[in-house]
Amino acid sequence: MGEEVKPEAKEAASAPQAVPAEEEEKKKDVAEEKKVAAEEEKPKEEEEPQPPPPPPPFILYVDLHCVGCAKKIERSILKIRGVEEVVMDMNENQVTIKGVLDPQAVCNKIKKKTKRMAKVLSPLPAAEGEPLPPIITSQVSGGLTTVELSVNMHCQACADQLKKKILKMRGVQTTVTEHTTGKVIVTGTMDAEKLVDYVYRRTKKQARIVPQPDPEPEAPAAAQEEKKEESGEGNEKPPETGEEKEEEKKKEGEENGEEGGGEEAAATEEERRDNEMTAMAQEEGMKRMMYYYQPSYVIERIPPPQLFSDENPNACCIS
């Protein structure tokens, strides 16, 4: 009876061996879960969004008259928050700004602080709303006229300012200015004399109308037909023989000898007069280009007094 082992004791002896096996399986499951979580976290870290690239610099058009204006505008722009760098181009009246800010807001601040016209050249703002209808110019009975003026302009800024003033005149459609030649071409329905007065009132610059050459009159078709008939295209004469040609030449020579060459003499006289006129015009032009020196200062050299001169002992006497 004492040798038999109870089944309850056997179960109690096998229980401690089963517990460690379950713990090992749990540990393995936890380790696998950690590996999977680590593998999932790695691509998330790699896929983190990169910072956006800085915006490209934008270009503004501003009226720059001189170096003082440019420095004043540059200082006012650098005070705006977000501006990193400012580059001024006085030849083209352009300002390049680098920074994170709205170009239109910068334009408005420049207009408010400096009282100068400014607009965005690049990048252009997106169009809002529906596109504007095309402008239809009214048909005037007088029609368009082109007037060429001669105005003294010192620099490109003067030319731009003059163009802006002329475009505000009623009836002006297009204006082209060239400061190198002082030429201004205006197209529109305005009066030329009123345009000259307007330019002087607005800019205090003297303008002069350049006269245009008259167009060459076209020969009518009837005159061309008469010339053809006179040349003998319609009525062709029979060919002349050699003897007849010689006789005609002799007759022409005798007539020219009797008349004394009137037509040729008149032609040579006109050429001589033209040559004299051109020579006189050239001489007058050379006189204008000559430099006349100022008259020299004349010094009158008075002879020395002869009162106490050794050369003339009779100049003085003591009585």
From Swiss-Prot:
Binding site for a metal cation 1: C66, C69
Coiled coil, from the record: 21-48
Signal sequence residues: none
Regions crossing the membrane: none
Residues cleaved off as propeptide: 317-319
Occurrences of domain HMA (ranges): 55-118, 144-208
Record bears the keyword Repeat: yes
Modified residues (Cysteine methyl ester): C316
Entries under InterPro entries matching the protein: HIPP09-like (IPR044258), HMA_dom (IPR006121), HMA_dom_sf (IPR036163)
Lipidation (S-farnesyl cysteine): C316
Domain of life: Eukaryota
CDD domains reported for this sequence: HMA (cd00371)
Entry keyword annotation includes Coiled coil: yes
Keywords from the named record: Coiled coil, Lipoprotein, Metal-binding, Methylation, Prenylation, Repeat
Record field: compositional bias (Basic and acidic residues): 1-11, 24-45, 224-254
Biased composition (Acidic residues): 255-268
Binding site for a metal cation 2: C155, C158
Family in the record: Belongs to the HIPP family.
Functional summary from the UniProt entry: Heavy-metal-binding protein.
Annotated protein name in UniProt: Heavy metal-associated isoprenylated plant protein 9
Organism: Arabidopsis thaliana
Gene label: HIPP09
